[in-house]
Regions:
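Short metal-coordination and nucleic-acid-contact micro-motifs, chiefly zinc-binding Cys/His arrays
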Residues: 1, 21
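Short, surface-exposed polybasic-aromatic patches that bind anionic ligands, especially phosphate groups
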Residues: 3, 11, 15-16, 26, ...
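Membrane-proximal low-complexity regions enriched in glycine and acidic/polar residues
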Residues: 97-145, 244-332
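Extracytoplasmic/lumenal ectodomains and periplasmic regions of secretory and membrane proteins
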Residues: 138-190, 292-353
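Short, aromatic-rich amphipathic segments at membrane interfaces
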Residues: 205-214, 349-376
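Juxtamembrane interface at the cytosolic side of transmembrane helices
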Residues: 213, 382-408
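N-terminal membrane-entry
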Residues: 218-225, 367-385
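Hydrophobic membrane-insertion alpha-helices, especially the h-region
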Residues: 220-237
């Protein structure tokens, strides 16, 4: 349908799949009423000094597997707060509505009014609990496009209940039955993909009425708990028969193995990967000794090196005795898997230490450690707590403009 405004000569051309009762010029906001003969007569004019912007009239997009056309837009105002509502019509006579508030979009459809009368503060609908967010009486400040009704000139009573990302909206005129809409958050990027607007859409400001959190915290917690349980069960299955095993223990003489390696007998490790703990002991006395250990995989010739100093000092000064260090120490080589291995050990001591004769080296293949699992559990718990308090903060901010906020 093409209509040229009598007041400003601006043409409006949109494919309209319904009988038009009212037309509003998008340039000067002149209101025209359809006559019985199909003509349009000037009725009034909205006093609105801004451009509506947003989605242009005539844009088409596919929603719910059906093509819809933007046939009209209404600007509503309440206490100097403005928002836009777009009318979308399909060729089969279906209507959908898009509400844009501060860059946040909600897709609405009319549903049967089988709710309790009045404005209940809580509604159970489709297994969701909707809570009353606001009751307002806005007016239509401006409009543009084609409409199948006469747009109301008085105040509209609205009640909005939310269960993000959904909402239920009640609208009622003074002498008419109320209309009920079910809304769902739709992202700005989705709007762009569906309608491909040529003009930039408004940027988001604040938290939208039904804007969802970045992710579902409850689902995140369930997923992380499931992952933790799976890891724990796998760990128990792999290591259920794992026992601590001493695979090597021997005293190594400093004089016999001076400047040469001690090669241990080969040993075989079976089962899942576990840490190999190397314990060293030497009779150091105000002196030091050192052990360098190479774990050699005889199947792959892969070598893992580590070394450990053993130091023990003691004395008496300023009327008090003191000690530092120990004659024993240990260290671990983590994640050693099954296979055949041997140790190549080099031991040295302080040249001035004439009393210390050797060092005892013991290698123990330990039981699997739960340390990594507990660290993972702690990290996951921290993630869930951060997500929970982030979502809580998000909800507090969402409800801060509502007189019915549950966070006071």
């Amino acid at each position: 349908m093409r209509i040229t405004c009598y007041q400003c000569d601006t043409p409006t051309d949109v494919e309209v799949p319904f009988p038009v009762k009212q037309f509003v010029c998008s340039n000067c906001f002149s209101i025209y009423k359809a006559t019985e003969t199909g003509d349009f007569t000037f009725k009034d004019k909205y006093k609105y000094d801004k451009q509506i912007g947003g989605l242009a009239l005539g844009l088409k997009g596919t929603l719910e597997e059906e093509e819809y056309t933007v046939t009209g837009v209404v600007v509503k105002e309440y206490m100097n707060y403005y928002w836009k509502e777009y009318v979308l019509a399909s060729t089969t006579g279906k209507f959908l509505y898009l509400s844009e508030v501060s860059g946040h979009w909600i897709l609405l459809r009319e549903i049967p009014d089988d709710f309790a009368k009045g404005h209940p503060k809580i509604i159970d609908y489709n297994d969701k609990v909707f809570k009353l967010y606001d009751i307002a009486r806005p007016r239509i400040a401006a409009a543009a496009g084609f409409f199948d009704i006469d747009l109301p000139t008085g105040l509209i009573t609205m009640a909005e209940l939310i269960a993000p990302p959904y909402m239920i909206s009640f609208e009622k005129l003074e002498k008419e039955e109320r209309t009920v809409f079910l809304g769902e958050h739709i992202s700005k990027n989705q709007i762009k993909r569906i309608f491909k607007p040529t003009k930039e859409l408004p940027n988001r400001i604040g938290i939208g009425l039904v804007q969802p959190y970045f992710f579902n915290v409850r689902q995140l917690a369930l997923i992380l708990c499931s992952v933790t349980l799976l890891i724990l069960l796998t760990h128990l299955y792999v290591y259920h028969d794992k026992q601590e095993e001493v695979v090597f223990s021997n005293d190594i003489s400093f004089s016999e193995y001076n400047d040469k390696e001690y090669i241990s007998p080969a040993f075989t490790l079976n089962g899942g990967a576990s840490p190999l703990t190397i314990s060293v002991h030497s009779g150091v006395d105000n002196s030091w000794a050192n052990a360098q250990v190479a774990l050699v995989n005889e199947d792959t010739n892969e070598e893992i090196y580590a070394n450990k100093d053993v130091e023990y000092y003691h004395g008496y000064s300023e009327g008090e005795s003191w000690t530092e260090g120990d004659q024993s120490d240990d260290f671990s080589i983590c994640g050693i898997g099954a296979g055949k291995y041997h140790l190549a050990i080099t031991v040295v001591k302080a040249p001035e230490d004439l009393n210390n004769t050797g060092m005892k080296v013991t290698a123990t293949w330990n039981k699997a450690s739960y340390w990594n699992i507990w660290m993972l559990v702690i990290i996951m718990a921290v993630i869930v707590l951060i997500a929970y308090f982030g979502e809580l903060y998000n909800e507090i901010k969402r409800w801060e403009d509502s007189p019915y906020t549950p966070y006071e």
